[in-house]
């Protein structure tokens, strides 16, 4: 609060308080404006400090913006350049539409619904009681198991 009061003081209010040694003596301009110039100097130095802080903040934000935009650009280029193995292809959508149509015709003919094979986070059940699942992306090419179990019909 004291800084605010100091900054809002009227710099000309103390001009009349300059001591005059004799009635006929005229104070010099420097003596009359000494306090006003001191207040002005304090305010200008405070303004300079704040502008320096503002400039430093702007530089920090510019550095962040440059780094963050580079990161976003890298993500965008990565999306164009990387071939995602598990991404659905246009044929996958066509196969799903055909599968849904086939299910609908079977349901109208038999009167009951055919459920999807159970999905437990990447492993598709090979239970023969379920309808054939779309195994377009169910490969074990990247598996750490060299010889996976073979499923037999006797299970």
From Swiss-Prot:
Principal location listed in the UniProt entry: nucleus
Keyword Cell division tagged: yes
GO cellular component: condensed chromosome, centromeric region; cortical microtubule; DASH complex; kinetochore; mitotic spindle; mitotic spindle polar microtubule; mitotic spindle pole body; nucleus
PTM comment text: Phosphorylated by plo1 at Ser-143 during prometaphase and metaphase to promote chromosome biorientation. Dephosphorylated in anaphase.
Phenotype for residue 143 to A/D: Resistance to thiabendazole
Subcellular location: Nucleus; Cytoplasm, Cytoskeleton, Spindle; Chromosome, Centromere, Kinetochore; Cytoplasm, Cytoskeleton
Protein's GO biological process: attachment of mitotic spindle microtubules to kinetochore; attachment of spindle microtubules to kinetochore; cell division; homologous chromosome orientation in meiotic metaphase I; microtubule depolymerization; mitotic metaphase chromosome recapture; mitotic sister chromatid biorientation; mitotic spindle formation (spindle phase one)
Residue numbers of Phosphoserine PTMs: 143
Keyword set, alphabetical order: Cell cycle, Cell division, Centromere, Chromosome, Chromosome partition, Cytoplasm, Cytoskeleton, Kinetochore, Microtubule, Mitosis, Nucleus, Phosphoprotein
Summary of the knockout phenotype: Leads to mitotic defects in a proportion of cells, including an increased time spent in metaphase, abnormal reattachment of chromosomes that have become detached from the spindle, lagging chromosomes, unequal chromosome segregation, and ultimately cut cells (septation without chromosome segregation). Sensitive to thiabendazole, thermal stress, and osmotic stress. Simultaneous disruption of klp6 or klp5 is lethal and leads to the cut phenotype (septation without chromosome segregation).
Function: Component of the DASH complex that connects microtubules with kinetochores and couples microtubule depolymerisation to chromosome movement; it is involved in retrieving kinetochores to the spindle poles before their re-orientation on the spindle in early mitosis and allows microtubule depolymerization to pull chromosomes apart and resist detachment during anaphase.
Family, as annotated: Belongs to the DASH complex DAM1 family.
Record text on subunit structure and interactions: Component of the DASH complex consisting of ask1, dad1, dad2, dad3, dad4, dam1, duo1, dad5, spc19 and spc34, with a stoichiometry of one copy of each subunit per complex. Multiple DASH complexes oligomerize to form a ring that encircles spindle microtubules and organizes the rod-like NDC80 complexes of the outer kinetochore. DASH complex oligomerization strengthens microtubule attachments. On cytoplasmic microtubules, DASH complexes appear to form patches instead of rings.
Name of the featured protein: DASH complex subunit dam1
Organism: Schizosaccharomyces pombe (strain 972 / ATCC 24843) (Fission yeast)
Gene designation per UniProt: dam1
């Amino acid at each position: 609060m004291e800084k605010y009061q100091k900054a809002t003081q009227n710099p000309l209010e103390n001009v009349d308080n300059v001591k005059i040694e004799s009635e006929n003596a005229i104070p010099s301009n420097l003596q009359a404006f000494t306090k006003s110039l001191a207040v002005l100097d304090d305010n200008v130095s405070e303004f300079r400090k704040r502008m320096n802080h503002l400039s430093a903040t702007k530089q920090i934000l510019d550095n962040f913006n440059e780094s963050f935009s580079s990161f976003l650009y890298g993500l965008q280029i990565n999306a164009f350049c990387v071939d995602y193995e598990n991404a659905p292809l246009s044929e996958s959508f066509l196969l799903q539409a055909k599968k849904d149509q086939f299910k609908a015709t079977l349901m109208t003919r038999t009167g009951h619904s055919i459920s999807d094979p159970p999905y437990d986070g990447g492993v598709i059940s090979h239970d023969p009681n379920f309808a054939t699942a779309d195994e377009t992306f169910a490969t074990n090419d990247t598996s750490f198991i060299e010889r996976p179990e073979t499923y037999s019909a006797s299970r």
